[in-house]
Amino acid sequence: MHPRLSVVILGALLMACQDTATGSNAQQGSGELAGPPRMSVAELRERLHTEFPTQYAQWLAASVTSEAIGTLLLMNDAPVDIQRAGLLYSLYAGREFAPVFVDGQGGLTHRVQPVIATLLDARQHALPVQQFDTPTLAQALSMYEEFGAILSDVGPLILTRADLDAIDELLASDRIASAADPVDAMMRALFEGDPALAPLPELAASHEARVRAARALAGASAVAEALLMDRALDYAFAQRHFNLFTFDEEPSEEEGQRIVAERLTGTFQALADAPDAPAVQTVLDALPPTLPQYALLMPAAARYREIVAQGGWNEIDGLTLRRGNRHVKVAALKERLQMEGYYTGPIDETFDQALKDAVELYERTHQMEVDGETDRTFWASLNIPAEERLAQIELTMQRWRESRIGDDLYYILVNIPDFHAEVWRNGVRDMRFRIVVGNTQRVCDPRTERMRYANATPLQSAYMTHLVLNPYWNVPRRILEEELIPNLLEDGNYFEENGIEQSEDGTVRLRPGPSNPLGRVKFIFPNPHATYLHDTNRRNYFQFPVRAFSHGCMRVHEPENLMEYLLTQDGQYNERDIERSFERGREDGRSLTTPVPVHVEYYVVRIDDEGYVNFNSDIYKYDRDRLRPEEARNERCEPEARPGMRLVLSEDGRPMVQDAEGNLIDPSATNVEEVIPASDGAGPAAGDYGP
């Protein structure tokens, strides 16, 4: 909690500024005027007579305010919490500590209102307003404006006849020849105490009083200026500046700090250079993610925020209902579905066609089997509190801020909970197709002693570099040990019957063909997890709304359409050539001239093309772990030791199993239960050993 800003607290800063305004080292900041083009004496006289009072006030305010800003940012015990004081000091030093938001005279620049409005609107971006401490900021600005009244008490600067005569005398004297800018010269004379160049006796007499009044305001000016800029940069950081993803090697901590500082510097400079309020707003509007889903989620979050503010919805004890039923629960169901916009008809106790349509819409947007009936799964979903639904939407918005997509114009996005992948090009979604992702089998991690998803499709980004037609499947060691070796121990002819080849070093691969789990094409984006997109010989899984059946790779529903699209965009698609390759059946690699970014990400909430909010399955509990981390911490387990085994060839070329002690096991004469203990983990469907 920030300390209360008051005259007493600001006193420390004001004291630190006491000796800065009138000494020979006074900073001139932005008040210093550039030398104008040479003018006639008459033009100079007119300029000085009309502009000098305004320029003098600006010069004075800039001098003491600039010094106060520098002093505040160097204080170890500053009266307010400036999170980025070191960075701000270097940024303001680059502009001689000239303020961006205050004018040093109790007034605010055109940049303030858009920044304040944006900070107050942070809740619309699912960012906590309290993070930017707007009450303290508002208090600082209010105090600054109150201190501005001190200058008003001194009264406006009005040149006397004696001052005007002195100006005319100066212009008529030889002293004008030594000054590139007469206004600048007289201003320096007043600040640096050179009476020989300050022929304004009446003004000189009131100068000290005006300096004291400006100094009293300077502390409040510095606090308001630094606090507002600090919060503006904090907002920029929270939106996207924190995101350090790069396709290159992950930056070191030092390099990451440099990148963030560079981004914040760019925002600082853009705000300082913005010529008017609309330009400031343009700078601020460019900070949030520009990806389409983010913009669609904002009004959805606002709608659910309003539902929560009105008390949310009540839980309904469910029962199976279908069209034609009459029951008091039907009215409650209609009212409940109406709250989220799924039902728009009258509230009564008849389960009519309109309600059936609404139930089907709810099922379709919540990854259920669509049958229009209210079963146990339906009620469990419907009774999730509104607060939790809002939290899911807001977390999804945060995940979009964390997205690795960046400024890519052409990319493939795999959204794991959505069980779909999309191809985007120049802001347009060219393709959307179903996928199967890693299953939800859980094992005990021996390192953390907590349950984890053994086959979860990893979140990552990499460049797709090539496609392979008629691919071999090189079986990963884990799948070999956990599934193929047990199959071999049960049936000594299993490898031969299923087109599996074994090399002398124990590696195993499946030949191209109808039984190959990779189907007819795979799409390679080299990555540490060795996962990829591919066709499949098990197409029945695509009929299910929740499609978590693989060992981590992503099975594509329309692989040949994706292949045609990618090769066409790459300028090398030839239908007849592809057909001949499939007919030959030999493995055939095709490199992409321009690699395509592939982003595998995790968004539980999605807005569909009709504008409905889709709440998808949190299949790997990643959202749960962030929203309710205590549940994840409680999932402790004891690792189960399993025998390590590998394949070797016998002297006559038959596959043999070698256990951890080096013993050879003949698959044709072994009971698998004697070698491998049964696992109680829920794995893929029987016989589905594909990637």
Predicted features along the sequence, with ranges:
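Bacterial N-terminal signal peptides that target proteins for export
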Residues: M1-S6
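C-terminal motif of bacterial Sec signal peptides marking the signal peptidase cleavage site
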Residues: L13-A16
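Well-ordered beta-sheet/strand-loop patches within structured domains
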Residues: Q18-R84, L88, A93, L233-D234, ...
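Zn2+-dependent metallopeptidase catalytic domains
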Residues: A21, A26-M186, F191, A196-S206
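Generic structural signal for hydrophobic core residues of well-folded globular domains
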Residues: L119, R123, Y235-R240, L382, ...
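Short acidic, glycine/serine/threonine-rich helix-capping segments at coil-helix boundaries
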Residues: V129-D133, A138-L141, E145, S152-D165, ...
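Short, hydrophobic/amphipathic alpha-helical patches that form generic packing surfaces
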Residues: V223-F242
